[in-house]
């Protein structure tokens, strides 16, 4: 009995430890826009930088779904909405089930057989899985998927061990309960089908096959989603310049913008563009909220300094697309009870605080340009500029009138983003 208890304790610690690490990796997005970003990255930046430094591990820090680009297709938008739904539903379900179990222990209600426990034996673990999948969609780094798959495996074995202990303690009642419920999903068949000899679950190889298969399926899904994402992005290319818009409504403007910049790249104001290098340009509103993840364009876009973390996180979860269209001034306006349109004009990065201007139809756009290293002189265009193996270094930004092609201002930037050397999203 002691051996069984020790084994369960070890399994429980491993499983809960995995979800703690997963939560830290997944909730990085919350921490990175909070005043605690410095403390978090003082611990984890060496890990991220180490992984990002080697081609064999650089994929772990990259993203498999759009995070700062508004999803361009219906399928990707549905996935993004599902992320918010699963994140919230999983968290709420877990809290309800946890209350049911722990109140049952306090008041000695016996086995939990009501609510979701009437249909499945481990709704808490199912809820954690839902929350985890939602978190992985909301903050889609590959390293989050790795820990998510490990969490799946550990909680599967922890569930089986819990069932063995319950059968030993309540052989008749728990056996009947198992016959009428599913492990993680409601049972469809009335009779519990026995595992046949030779089946994977009865094979001695199962302890190796199940973890490997789980990790492989989860990561393969991530790579598939990344490929679908890259193929859905509408690039415009002119010479060594490839461009993409952050917002889909700006897609018609990209062709004019890339041609205007290509025609002026020999100008001294665009001296940061070299003919022998390849560049990826992100087209966005001048006050686009997440531009600090691409380049350090000024303290207004250092989100960890804005002191409105809760509002931004709520917006990110509850408004999957509109949060990308809101400027940093919008949240500050709400905090100080100021008209958002007035605040947006007042904080316009181009200094165009004109009451007659309507920011919603503003013709000006900012283009942040990053240099893409082709590794060995290979020229990269289109989706190849987002290759996992291609380093991307910020070089400058251009403010342009998208209607006329007139360049208003250009500025060189440092080689780091607003988060210094931390690998940030490229999509």
Question: Positions of the model-derived regions?
Answer:
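Membrane-anchoring alpha-helices and their flanking helix-loop junctions
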Residues: 1-113, 131-426
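Conserved SAM-binding loop
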Residues: 119-126
């Amino acid at each position: 009995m002691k051996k069984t208890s020790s084994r369960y304790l070890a399994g429980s610690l491993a499983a809960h430890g995995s979800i703690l690490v997963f939560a830290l990796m997944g909730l990085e997005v919350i921490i990175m826009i909070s005043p605690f970003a410095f403390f978090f990255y003082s611990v984890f930046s060496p890990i991220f930088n180490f992984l990002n430094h080697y081609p064999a591990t650089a994929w772990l820090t990259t993203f498999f779904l759009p995070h700062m680009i508004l999803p361009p297709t219906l399928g990707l938008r549905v996935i993004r909405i599902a992320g918010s739904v699963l994140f919230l539903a999983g968290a709420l379900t877990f809290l309800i089930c946890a209350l049911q179990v722990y109140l049952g222990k306090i008041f000695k209600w016996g086995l939990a057989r009501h609510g979701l426990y009437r249909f499945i034996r481990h709704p808490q673990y199912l809820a954690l899985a839902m929350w985890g999948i939602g978190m992985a969609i909301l903050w889609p780094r590959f390293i989050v998927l790795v820990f998510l798959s490990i969490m799946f495996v550990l909680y599967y074995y922890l569930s089986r061990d819990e069932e063995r202990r319950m059968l030993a303690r309540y052989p008749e009642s728990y056996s009947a309960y198992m016959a009428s419920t599913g492990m993680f999903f409601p049972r469809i068949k009335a009779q519990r089908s026995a595992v046949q000899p030779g089946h994977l679950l009865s094979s001695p190889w199962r302890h190796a096959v199940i973890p490997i298969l789980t990790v492989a399926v989860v990561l393969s899904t991530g790579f598939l989603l990344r490929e679908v994402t890259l193929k859905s992005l509408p690039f415009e290319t002119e010479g060594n310049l490839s461009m993409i818009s952050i917002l889909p409504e700006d897609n018609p403007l990209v062709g004019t913008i890339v041609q205007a910049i290509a025609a002026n790249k020999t100008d001294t104001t665009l001296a940061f563009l070299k003919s022998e290098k390849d560049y990826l340009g992100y087209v966005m509103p001048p006050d686009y909220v997440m531009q600090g993840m691409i380049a350090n364009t000024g303290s207004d876009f250092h989100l960890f300094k804005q002191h409105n973390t809760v509002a931004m996180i709520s917006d990110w979860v509850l408004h999957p697309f509109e949060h990308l269209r809101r400027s940093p001034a919008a949240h500050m306006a709400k905090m100080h009870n100021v008209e958002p349109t007035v605040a947006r004009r007042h904080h316009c990065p181009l200094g165009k605080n004109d009451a007659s201007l309507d920011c919603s139809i503003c013709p000006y756009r900012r283009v942040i340009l990053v240099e893409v290293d082709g590794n060995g002189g290979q020229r990269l265009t289109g989706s190849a500029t987002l290759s996992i193996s291609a380093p991307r270094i910020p070089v400058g930004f251009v403010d342009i009138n998208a209607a006329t092609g007139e360049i208003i201002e250009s500025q060189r930037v440092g080689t780091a983003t607003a988060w210094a050397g931390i690998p940030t999203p490229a999509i």
